[in-house]
């Protein structure tokens, strides 16, 4: 079974580029074990539809990378990471945990 990654972002938040690069590094060699979808959130309506936690957000099998719950009122906003954007190592570790759990 493949692990599904959903990368949610919007262009108005500059941190999505760094996280997208970290994600690209994190998945090297795992391409046959994952499927990835990039979701561009363009407005408040689409933010509500995807239950947007802010840009950038990575969902792994529908769960937030850092366990952030779905907000009561999703909106088009930049996401604040108190410890900074997740590193490629942190992302890879979380993906591998899901892969190992699924198998």
Feature annotation, model-predicted:
Residues 63-100:
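Non-catalytic, surface beta->alpha helical segment in thiol-disulfide oxidoreductase systems
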Residues 1-4, 99-103:
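Compositionally biased, disordered extreme N-termini, encompassing classical targeting presequences
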Residues 1-29:
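Local sequence-structure signature of Cys/Sec-based thiol-disulfide redox active-site neighborhoods
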Residues 46-50:
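Short, solvent-exposed polar/charged micro-motifs at secondary-structure junctions
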Residues 51-60, 66:
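Structural micro-motif
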Residues 20-23, 53-54, 72-73:
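Short, glycine/charged-enriched secondary-structure capping and boundary segments
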Residues 34-45:
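Thiol-based oxidoreductase modules, predominantly thioredoxin-like and allied folds used
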